[in-house]
Amino acid sequence: MLDFSKNNLKNDKTKKTLLLNKDFTPVSIIPLSVLSWKESIKLFFMNDIEIIDIYEDILIRSPNISINLPSIVILKKYLNIKNFKLKVDFNKRNILIRDLLTCQYCGKKYQENIFDKNILNNFLTIDHIIPRSKGGKSDWTNVVLSCKECNIEKSDKIIYPKIMPKKPTYYELIEKRKHLPIKISNKSWIHYIQSFWKNKDLIIIEEEEV
């Protein structure tokens, strides 16, 4: 049985493994293709991946072997994502991406960390253009990001944003995702994602985050 104890991990159970396609690009961008330690080790022993980089200070042990936790792995066979239906889920995270952390009424942009779980409580709200009390639906064409001030002023009135919202395509969402921060577990990942996040100030390395 594999040992993933705190002594081996320096209290770091959250470290992820970046999964690359055979062409050395991430398998997906939304979300970024990362694996848990269990998934990466399982794929390794199934001979589906090769290890590109490791966490030198994180060791996983079993009675017969010891192995460093992979930081970056690559598929041995190319996975053609065009064979899959590229679905865009309607959820809070994707609304944040589509609207670029920007109030769609006053245009105020928030620079807060997109990974902050309280962002929709402290800074922005998801507003229904046509309020639900007046029959408005919860879908891509009726919800936008709003700052709290605009949301309070709007109340249950029907006020239209500067640009009417629409459902983004998968590739439109990827283009917008490039303009928002991305959190990574290891700076060795930068080499493989920098073609997507060309502004390196948007790349946040977990152990260096302040």
Regions found by a protein language model. Name each.
Residues 120, 130-143:
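Short linker/helix segments within small regulatory modules
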Residues 115-130, 157-165:
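Short cysteine/histidine-rich zinc-coordinating motifs and their immediately flanking basic loops
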Residues 137, 141-210:
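A detector for short metal-coordination/catalytic motifs
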Residues 32-63:
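N-terminal juxtadomain amphipathic helix
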Residues 1-44:
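General detector of N-terminal leader/presequence modules that precede the first folded domain
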Residues 87-124, 144-148:
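Short cysteine-rich loop/turn motifs with clustered Cys
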Residues 51-107, 179-184:
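Short, charged surface segments at domain edges that flank catalytic/cofactor-binding sites
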